[in-house]
Amino acid sequence: MTRLTTEFWISAYLKRLRLEAIPAFITKKGDSISGAVIVKINTLDGRAQSFYKTYNFELDEWRWDILISGSDLEVENSLKKQKTIDQDLWVIEVEDREGRHLLSEEGLAG
């Protein structure tokens, strides 16, 4: 199976969010070919979550799991640590009061 480049996937993800009028932006740009992606959801009430993609061997599929959920400050501190560990990492921040992120949508989930 052919894999999409990270930069292509992010471009498609941001477009899908724009189509739903969900603001999002890149806060850290990583490796354009194979950089890992963390998506931070900021609900604009002092709370946030971040998601990362992981492989479920039992179900033989990729899925998005929660890396951390808590105050915006806690999530930002976690992301700061992740950025120092992985220089190729991309971080996308989504701002939505309802917490919508579309990561479970067809074409984005796996």
Tell what function each PLM region has.
Residues M1-G110:
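Polybasic/polar functional segments that serve as interface/processing modules
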